[in-house]
A protein has these predicted regions:
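Glyoxalase I/VOC metalloenzyme domain signal
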Residues: 1-73, 82-240
């Protein structure tokens, strides 16, 4: 067991030759398949775990993941809003099976700093889960009462101009507030974020159609959305 960000525990699991891992020896619970069919909304596997860390610690933790687990930097972001900003360094495992983005505030009032105050330290900001059909998944989750972050209407008005020939149903995206990013070369990515679910922690639902990024074009939109909520709540103030 290793100590990770914010005192979290990272468990290293043995592989037992051809027999696999210790999880392969677990007994199945009777009726699990029926329960899964009844309760599933189409979520599949963990895509990434985004962490918020204190100012000056992003490079420390990216170095930790690099030296201990051989993770490499996949992407670096410098995001600025109306009054605040953040740096983000996305790390990826050698087999590309898991990604660990690390966020660090550029100032004392950003959403990263607010998270650290509410969470009482560094920790996971959001958990991203994959789906093969984001429309059906989000509609099923909404029907069960899950609330998602909103996006300004002009975002959807500009999709066809920003990504010509994307082939997605913009009206259904608008109805569900689903974001899109990508290119002809890299493929597409569809994503949406829930409201805070456990304290300041929220979830991301993501469908990858060849794109291995993080919705680079949407990162700014997400930051702006959360910053706008901070302004509305009086956490930060901007000149009129």
């Amino acid at each position: 067991v290793l100590q990770g960000i914010g005192g979290s525990l990272l468990y290293v699991i043995d592989q037992y030759g051809e027999t696999g891992s210790l999880y392969d020896a677990w007994d199945e619970i009777e009726g699990w398949e029926e329960a899964e069919r009844k309760n599933s909304v189409g979520l599949e596997i963990l895509d990434h775990l985004t962490h918020n860390v204190r100012r000056g610690e992003m490079r420390t933790w990216s170095g930790f993941y690099n030296s201990v687990f051989n993770f490499e930097e996949q992407k670096y972001f410098d995001i600025k809003g109306k009054a605040t900003g953040l740096f983000s360094q996305a790390m990826i495992a050698p087999d590309r099976a898991i990604r660990i983005p690390l966020n660090e505030s550029q100032d004392e009032n950003s959403q990263i700093e607010e998270f650290i105050r509410r969470y009482n330290g560094e920790g996971i900001q959001h958990i991203a889960l994959t789906t093969e059909n984001i429309f059906e998944t989000v509609e099923a989750m909404r029907a069960r009462g899950v609330e998602f972050q909103d996006t300004i209407e002009t975002y959807f008005e500009l999709i066809d101009k920003r990504l010509p020939g994307h082939g997605e149903d913009v009206e259904r995206m608008r109805k569900n507030r689903i974001l899109i990013d990508g290119s002809d070369e890299e493929g597409l990515l569809l994503q949406i974020f829930t409201q805070d679910t456990f304290g300041p922690i929220f979830f991301e639902i993501i469908q990858r159609k060849g794109n291995e990024g993080f919705g680079n074009g949407n990162f700014q939109a997400l930051f702006d959305s959360i910053e706008l909520d901070q302004i509305r709540r009086g956490v930060i103030k901007v000149d009129a």
